[in-house]
């Protein structure tokens, strides 16, 4: 049922905490509604843990959308991600897996303002995504706080879908950053071996 012929897969990672899911799901559902007004050949695959599947399902069932699926099996998740034409992910280590499979993506994140303000005071980084932090620039688009809304998400995702060059450029850039990270990890392992 998931791998319907003539349908392109978009993988969606709405978070691993209930609080994140409750903030991001309404945004994601409204984004899918906007997409469905124009595009009719996408299936949205929500990657979830077994414990959060029901919560995500409740959001999907609350609206008239029939092109969403939820998966919680890790093997199926990897297979689905590999076959995806795009990924939308809450910031976190999952972005490394997305890049490893050469899937173009966007990072979204929203938290309550007090927590965000405290986090910004404690962590002085320009980006939240590990690829962007390593690159020192925005390789993967990030929609944070107020920018994390259905309209901006639709605008960026559709701009990628409509432009194969943009997709190719992002994949090339992420692969370059991944290779740099691998080299740095290998070098630090060699150094620690030499010093031990």
Residue ranges and their predicted role:
Residues 1-196:
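Nucleotide-activated sugar donor-binding and catalytic core shared by glycosyltransferases
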């Amino acid at each position: 049922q998931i791998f319907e012929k003539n349908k392109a897969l978009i993988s969606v990672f709405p978070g691993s905490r209930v609080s994140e899911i409750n903030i991001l799901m309404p945004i994601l559902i409204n984004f899918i509604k906007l997409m469905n007004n124009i595009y009719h050949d996408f299936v949205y695959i929500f990657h979830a843990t077994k414990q959060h599947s029901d919560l995500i399902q409740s959001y999907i069932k609350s609206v008239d959308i029939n092109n969403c699926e939820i998966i919680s099996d890790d093997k199926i998740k990897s297979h689905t991600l590999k076959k995806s034409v795009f990924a939308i992910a809450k910031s976190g280590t999952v972005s490394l897996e997305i890049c490893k499979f050469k899937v173009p993506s966007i990072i979204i994140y929203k938290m309550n303002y007090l927590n965000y303000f405290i986090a910004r005071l404690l962590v002085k980084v320009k980006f939240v995504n590990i690829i962007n932090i390593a690159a020192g620039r925005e390789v993967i688009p990030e929609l944070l706080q107020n920018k994390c809304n259905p309209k901006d998400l639709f605008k960026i995702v559709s701009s990628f879908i409509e432009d194969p060059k943009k997709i190719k450029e992002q994949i090339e850039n992420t692969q370059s950053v991944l290779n740099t990270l691998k080299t740095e990890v290998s070098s630090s392992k060699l150094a620690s071996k030499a010093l031990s």
